[in-house]
């Protein structure tokens, strides 16, 4: 009895001592500034000789000065803010939501991303189990770009079947109920990713190897590029294209007839504004310091914003009308499951899960942690579960599904700071960016051509990530056949999006059957969804084969181990770390294939 009392007293003393030391450390230089050489964060002075130096590495739980953690957290937030704010604006435009609602969705997305990132980094152990929620690493969550490839198709179908309203001229009216139905469907379908998080990662890698992930990511990026280019040319909606005289009554200038400096779609002025963003990104990549390159997309956007503001393209009424502070649920949407969207949403969560595996592997690599074994598997499990729960909660917070972003891996690699404290600061900064609604309103007020110049580059980087994954698999007959089959319908549906619209001609009273047929139509007309289903199916049924002509020096099996640079992996799949041992494991079991894929990883 006396021993237990002594133990309790010792524990209390330890807690008190730790608290005392923490309070005392607040008043020290080491706590706030430390002895870090902050010149590492500054650009190099041109035409001067400088001694080569490398910043120290800060591990996951190392003591990092508050100032350094704040600066690096801000760097992480800048690297992902463009990717977080673009999807809500694009999806809101597809639902023709009001400017006030669009402002709110951008704010809600930033707030949700900040809160869910905190949970992902903190990592919570589920009591009495071996499972976790979160990775426990510097993993940031943002709005999935895959949603951008699904939502416009779903909302377009809602307008066609009467779920969303049109006026007597056929002009699409605001459809908040359609957006709410998309949220409800996303919320329910997120249970699939939550379920998959409890499947061992090795099995998931067998089900979804690079031959599946590569073409799917390529198709996602390709399908998104058209949306970015439409914005680059002036915007989407009633102003798109140049109408004939018969179509003129329903046509408007971009972004609208009453907007300042309104012009016709595709005008040279619009193309020039978007090109200013694109050119700035290229200039920074060529002449900018390494740390600046990780935020080249945002800096390009800033340059485009300055040019467009100076030439009178901004609608300041959007910013003036926005409240100073906002929060989730200021605007709500009626939640109702839209059956035809279930299949595409399930495909979306499969893709998000595949991306999470690659991102977690990349973050572990640049954080100098294990990329194999039980500890790594636990991080993968926690990360996928964190993604699934974040998407479920985000849907209830009026935000579309979230996923682990990859661009922060480039910041970690350059700054050599994998410390979670920097991640916590990043999450808090994102939260306050969303909390102050004026900040979100700035992103809504950005002229479409300026935003299009940035998003087209972002979306193209998604496609490049898919190409990078594909380039690292053996190009034997089996893999070429799977790629060809998945690209046949996947790329075809992107190029001719309404090719399957008239396949079903049923118009009877059976609403369940109509919903089922609409679901099939959505899948067949969504390039990444049909491509994913085909590649998964063929990968499971086609036998593996050995090609003696393929070696590690073959063009189809690169052995270079690239590192995320914050540009190529803007969307969220690291092509190197997502390449698993799957092909090798299968081949060893069947004693047919001896290609050493581990060298790629």
Curated annotation (Swiss-Prot):
- Protein name (database record): Putative purine permease C1399.01c
Protein species of origin? Schizosaccharomyces pombe (strain 972 / ATCC 24843)
Q: In its UniProt record, which GO terms are filed under biological process?
A: pyrimidine nucleobase transmembrane transport; xanthine transport
Q: What is its subcellular localisation? A: Vacuole membrane
Keywords assigned:
Membrane, Transmembrane, Transmembrane helix, Transport, Vacuole
Is the keyword Iron in the record? no
Transmembrane segment boundaries: 64-84, 102-122, 131-151, 179-199, 207-227, 264-284, 294-314, 337-357, 424-444, 450-470, 481-501, 522-542
Per the record, the similarity remark reads: Belongs to the nucleobase:cation symporter-2 (NCS2) (TC 2.A.40) family.
């Amino acid at each position: 009895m006396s021993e237990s009392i002594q133990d309790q007293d010792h524990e209390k003393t330890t807690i008190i001592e730790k608290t005392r030391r923490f309070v005392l450390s607040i008043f020290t230089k080491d706590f706030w500034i430390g002895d870090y050489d902050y010149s590492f964060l500054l650009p190099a002075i041109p035409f001067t000789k400088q001694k080569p130096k490398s910043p120290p590495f800060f591990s996951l739980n190392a003591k990092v000065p508050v100032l350094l953690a704040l600066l690096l957290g801000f760097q992480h937030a800048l690297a992902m803010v463009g990717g977080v704010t673009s999807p809500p604006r694009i999806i809101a435009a597809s639902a023709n939501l009001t400017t006030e609602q669009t402002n709110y969705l951008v704010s809600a997305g930033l707030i949700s991303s900040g809160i869910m990132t905190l949970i992902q980094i903190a990592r919570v152990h589920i009591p009495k189990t071996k499972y976790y929620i979160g990775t426990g690493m510097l993993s940031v969550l943002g709005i999935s770009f895959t949603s951008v490839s699904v939502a416009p198709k779903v909302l377009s179908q809602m307008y066609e079947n009467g779920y969303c309203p049109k006026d007597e001229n056929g002009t699409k009216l605001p459809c908040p109920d359609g957006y709410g139905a998309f949220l409800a469907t996303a919320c329910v379908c997120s249970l699939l990713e939550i379920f998959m998080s409890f499947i061992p990662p090795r099995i998931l890698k067998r089900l979804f190897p690079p031959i599946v992930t590569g073409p799917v990511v390529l198709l996602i990026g390709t399908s998104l590029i058209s949306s970015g280019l439409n914005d680059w040319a002036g915007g989407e909606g009633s102003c798109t294209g140049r109408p004939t005289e018969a179509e003129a009554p329903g046509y408007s200038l971009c972004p609208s007839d009453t907007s300042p400096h309104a012009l016709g779609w595709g005008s040279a002025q619009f193309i020039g504004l978007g090109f200013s963003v694109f050119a700035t990104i290229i200039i920074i990549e060529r002449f900018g310091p390494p740390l600046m390159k990780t935020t080249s997309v945002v800096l390009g956007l800033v340059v485009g914003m300055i040019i467009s503001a100076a030439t009178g393209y901004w609608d300041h009424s959007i910013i003036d009308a926005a409240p100073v502070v906002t929060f989730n649920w200021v605007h709500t949407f009626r939640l109702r499951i839209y059956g035809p969207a279930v299949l595409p949403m399930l495909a979306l969560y499969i893709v998000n899960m595949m991306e999470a595996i690659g991102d977690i592997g990349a973050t572990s690599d640049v954080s100098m942690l294990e990329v194999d074994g039980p500890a790594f598997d636990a991080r993968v499990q926690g990360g996928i579960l964190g993604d699934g729960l974040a998407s479920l909660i985000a849907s209830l917070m009026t935000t579309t599904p979230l996923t682990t972003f990859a661009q922060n891996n480039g910041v970690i690699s350059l700054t050599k700071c994998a410390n979670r404290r920097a991640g916590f600061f990043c999450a808090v900064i994102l939260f306050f960016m969303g909390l102050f609604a004026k900040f979100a309103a700035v992103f809504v007020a950005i002229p479409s051509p300026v935003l299009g110049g940035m998003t087209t580059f972002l979306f193209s980087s998604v496609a490049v990530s898919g190409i990078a994954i594909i380039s690292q698999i053996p190009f034997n007959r089996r893999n070429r056949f799977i790629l060809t089959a998945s690209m046949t319908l996947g790329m075809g549906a992107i190029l001719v999006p309404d090719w399957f619209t008239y396949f079903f001609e049923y118009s009877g009273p059976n609403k369940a059957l109509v919903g089922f047929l609409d679901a099939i139509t959505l899948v067949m007309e969504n390039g990444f969804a049909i491509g994913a289903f085909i590649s998964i199916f063929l990968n499971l049924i086609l036998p593996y084969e050995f090609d003696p002509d393929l070696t590690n020096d073959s063009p189809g099996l690169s052995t270079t181990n690239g590192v995320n640079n914050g540009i190529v992996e803007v969307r969220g799949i690291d092509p190197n770390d997502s390449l698993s041992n799957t092909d090798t494991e299968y081949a060893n079991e069947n004693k047919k294939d001896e290609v050493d894929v581990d060298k790629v990883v």
